[in-house]
C-alpha cells in the first residue's frame, strides 16, 4: 500500500515535530515501522517527482521534466515491473502523468485498447484515477467525466461540476458561492460534509479496491489529492488551527535582498508575491493544516479496515509526499526550488515481516531518495531488480536493521523551470531553465545553467538564509560540490535496452560472427 499526500511538507506531522498539528494515525504507522528523517525527492514539482517515484529514475533520465511533459512510452514503471510478478497494481487518486500520445501513435497504439490503457496510466490499473484539479467536469486528455462528480450528483449535489461548485467552494453570508481557487476563502468550510469530500471518497475507493483484490496479490497506490490547493477543507477541519499554532514564517531580509537572478525571479513571480503576504499565509495555513488532519483521520479509518480484515499483518505500507510547500517561507510560494521546505518529504515504511522487527519504531537518519522506493518494492516481493535501469537502492537492508556498505552520502534533485513564470522574467529559452541540487550533511550546492551557483552551509546556517555562492572563502567547497554533482550526472543509467551482463557477454560478438577487425 503506497500512500502519497500531495504537497505535504515533511515537518507538518506530529511525528516529524509539529507542536500543534497532531497526526496520531500516521504517528502510529511510524511506531510500527521506520521513520526516515532525511528523505528527498528527485524534483520538487508534482509530475517529475512522481515519475521518479514510479520509474526509479532521475528526472532527466526518464524525461518527464514538468507537469505537462509526458512520460515516454518506453519508460517502465512500478505497474510494469510488478505485473510481471502476477501482482494487480491499481491507483486511487492522483498520478499527474500525461500519456505519450505521440509515442503511442507512432506504435499504432490507441487508448481504447488494453495496452493503450496501461501505457496511458503509467502502468497502473486506473481504478479511480483523479488528478484533482477540475475547473470543468472533463478529465484532462480524456472524454470521460469525473466519477467523483457523478457520485456527488447522485448524492443530490446539483450542477455539472460539483467538484468545483460544492467540494471546493464555500458559501457566503448571503448564500453566494465563494470559490476555493481564491486563497482568501481557504479558512472557510467547503459546501459538503467531510464524508462527501475528496479525501473521504478516495479512502472509500481504496478500501473497495482492497476488498475486491483480497484473494490475490495486490499493490495499491493511494494518492491523496490534498493538502494541495485548492486549500478548501470541510467542517470542522477548515478552522481547527489558528495563527498561534502555525510555524513562524521562515525568511529574512538577507534573502529578500539576494540578487541571484534565478532566486530573485522566483521571488518576483506572482505566486511568491501573494504567499509572501502575512494575511495570505495566515488564511491558507488554516485550511492546509486542516486538510492534513483530515487525511490522518481517514488513514485511521483505512488502518482499522486493514486490521479488521487481517491485512495489517500482511501488507507493507509506505507513506510519503511528492514534495513540500513553501507557504511564504524564503519569500516564496508553492514549491520548485531546493530549500528543505520544498525538496524534503516525510517517509515512513512499515513492513509487517519478522525480518523488520529490529527496526520497528526507529528513526533513520541515512539519506534516502524517491528513486529508492521502486527497488524496495521489487526487493520486498523478491522480483528481479533491473540494475541497468533503476538509479535508486533498495531500502530493505536498512529496514532489516543491516548496515549496508557504501550507502549514499548525498542526495540529488533537479528542476526544469521552463514552464515557470521565472523563465519569462529571465528571458530564457525553453531549454535553458534548468537547475540541479546536490546536498550532503554539511553543504547544499545548487547549479543553475547560465548563472552562478548557490551554496549553503547547513551546519552553521541550517535555515539556508546566507547564500555563499559568491564567497571567495568558499570557492574550494563549491568546486568540490560541483565535482560531486558532475559525478552524479555521469552515473545516470541511460543504456536501458541492454543489461550489464549482456554487454559483458556480447562484447566479442565480432569474433563469434567471424568478423575480423584490426587483424594483420
Report residues per predicted region:
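Residues forming the ATP-binding cleft of Hanks-type serine/threonine protein kinase domains
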Residues: 459
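Formylglycine-dependent sulfatase
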Residues: 1-448, 453, 462-483, 511-520
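An exposure/low-complexity boundary signal
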Residues: 496-520
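A contiguous, mid-protein "functional segment" used to position or interact
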Residues: 472-501
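Short alpha-helical linear motifs
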Residues: 246, 337-343, 491-496, 503-507
Amino acid at each position: 500500500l503506497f500512500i502519497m499526500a500531495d504537497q505535504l511538507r515533511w515537518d507538518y506531522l506530529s511525528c516529524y515535530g509539529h507542536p500543534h498539528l497532531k497526526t496520531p494515525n500516521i504517528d502510529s504507522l511510524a511506531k510500527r515501522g521506520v521513520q526516515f528523517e532525511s528523505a528527498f525527492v528527485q524534483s520538487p514539482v508534482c509530475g517529475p517527482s512522481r515519475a521518479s517515484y514510479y520509474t526509479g529514475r532521475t528526472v532527466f533520465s526518464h524525461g518527464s521534466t514538468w507537469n505537462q511533459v509526458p512520460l515516454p512510452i518506453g519508460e517502465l514503471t512500478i505497474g510494469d515491473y510488478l505485473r510481471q510478478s502476477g501482482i494487480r497494481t491499481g491507483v486511487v487518486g492522483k498520478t499527474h502523468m500525461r500519456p505519450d500520445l505521440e509515442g503511442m501513435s507512432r506504435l499504432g497504439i490507441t487508448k481504447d485498447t488494453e495496452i493503450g490503457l496501461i501505457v496511458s496510466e503509467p502502468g497502473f490499473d486506473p481504478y479511480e484515477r483523479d488528478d484533482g484539479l477540475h475547473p470543468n467536469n472533463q478529465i484532462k486528455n480524456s472524454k470521460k467525466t469525473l466519477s467523483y462528480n457523478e457520485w456527488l450528483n447522485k448524492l443530490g449535489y446539483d450542477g455539472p461540476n460539483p467538484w468545483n461548485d460544492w467540494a471546493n467552494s464555500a458559501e457566503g453570508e448571503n448564500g453566494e458561492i465563494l470559490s476555493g481557487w481564491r486563497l482568501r476563502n481557504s479558512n472557510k468550510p467547503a459546501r459538503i460534509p467531510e464524508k462527501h469530500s475528496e479525501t473521504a471518497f478516495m479512502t472509500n475507493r481504496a478500501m473497495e479496491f482492497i476488498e475486491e483484490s483480497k484473494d490475490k496479490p495486490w499493490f495499491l497506490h493511494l494518492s491523496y489529492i490534498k493538502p494541495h490547493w485548492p486549500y478548501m477543507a470541510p467542517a470542522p477541519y477548515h478552522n481547527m488551527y489558528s495563527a498561534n499554532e502555525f510555524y513562524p514564517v521562515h525568511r529574512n531580509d538577507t534573502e529578500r535582498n539576494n540578487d541571484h537572478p534565478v532566486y530573485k525571479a522566483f521571488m518576483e513571480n506572482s505566486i511568491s508575491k501573494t504567499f509572501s503576504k502575512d494575511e495570505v499565509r495566515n488564511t491558507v495555513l488554516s485550511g492546509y493544516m486542516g486538510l492534513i488532519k483530515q487525511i490522518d483521520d481517514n488513514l485511521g479509518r483505512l488502518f482499522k479496515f486493514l486490521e479488521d480484515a487481517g491485512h495489517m499483518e500482511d501488507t507493507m505500507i509506505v507513506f510519503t509526499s511528492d514534495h513540500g510547500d513553501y507557504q511564504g517561507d524564503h519569500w516564496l510560494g508553492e514549491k520548485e526550488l531546493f530549500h528543505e521546505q520544498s525538496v524534503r518529504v516525510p517517509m515512513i515504511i512499515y513492513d509487517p515481516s519478522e525480518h523488520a522487527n529490529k527496526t520497528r519504531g526507529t528513526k533513520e537518519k541515512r539519506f534516502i531518495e524517491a528513486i529508492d522506493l521502486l527497488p524496495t518494492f521489487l526487493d520486498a516481493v523478491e522480483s528481479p531488480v533491473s540494475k541497468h535501469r533503476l538509479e535508486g537502492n533498495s531500502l530493505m537492508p536498512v529496514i532489516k536493521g543491516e548496515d549496508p556498505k557504501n550507502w549514499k552520502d548525498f542526495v540529488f534533485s533537479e528542476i526544469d523551470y521552463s514552464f515557470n513564470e521565472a523563465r519569462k522574467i529571465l528571458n530564457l529559452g525553453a531549454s535553458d531553465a534548468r537547475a540541479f541540487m546536490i546536498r550532503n550533511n554539511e553543504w547544499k550546492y545548487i547549479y543553475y545553467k547560465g548563472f552562478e551557483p548557490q551554496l549553503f552551509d547547513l551546519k552553521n546556517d541550517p535555515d539556508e538564509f546566507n547564500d555563499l555562492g559568491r564567497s571567495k572563502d568558499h570557492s574550494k567547497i563549491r568546486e568540490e560540490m560541483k565535482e560531486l554533482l558532475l559525478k552524479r550526472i555521469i552515473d545516470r543509467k541511460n543504456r536501458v535496452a541492454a543489461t550489464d551482463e549482456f554487454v559483458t557477454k556480447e562484447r566479442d560478438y565480432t569474433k563469434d560472427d567471424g568478423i575480423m577487425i584490426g587483424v594483420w
